[in-house]
Amino acid sequence: MRPLTQDLSIFNQLDFERPPVGVKFQFFRPQSMKPMDAQKNLSFCEMLKETWEADEPFYFGKENNEACVGKILLGMDAMEPFAESGQIGERLGIFQEARANYIFYQYVPKFEKGIINYVAFSPLEKLTFEPDVLIITATHGQAEIVMRAMTYSTGELYQSRTTPVMGCAWIYIYPFQSGKVNFIVPEMVHGMKGRELSADDSILISIPYHWIPVMTQNLKEMQMHLPSHAGKEEYLAEFGGILGGLAEKSKRP
């Protein structure tokens, strides 16, 4: 794995309750990193929590147990025909009929068989490799700052893509494959809500490697906490002052 060359310490200034997590997809086994405890039986999304709680970075491999659809999405296992037909989602009450569950599978991002054999995880403070995806768990206020760091110098639109199940595909795989920053509300994803992945007011933001340098630099440059966000009175005063000043200045362009 390529050693970390970026200074990502600016993210610490946002005081996240849980540290950002760097994720790396690997064909070959990561060196100088311990495997995930063989006794663990976690879902792919729960490996975020495991990263927060573990003492050191670790990697997950196809020899490890996985309690949900992670191995299927990573191309390590095939989906059972009864599951692929949509039977599970109907029985969970998520979909009216199996057909609706089946139809949405075509939209879920996944890796081809045999491409990914290992996935490395590290909390930001112990990150030593260049991550493929940096995953942030944020409050709504923190999420506003992180997402603004994307559009600050680029004008890029905010976009959120997910599905009611297989939400882990949209925080791990979709950003990596598409090169787009994605954010989701865990409470809107069946498994994440049921497994109590994060606090009720959380937003998960996934930053692919393409965007990490841009957003890091923008966080360093921009004003994180805007005066207008202090309250309605401050917002109206600042906005009104700017409009008045521009109206006056525009008389003599």
Language-model segment annotations:
Residues P3-P253:
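Acidic, serine/proline-rich low-complexity intrinsically disordered regions
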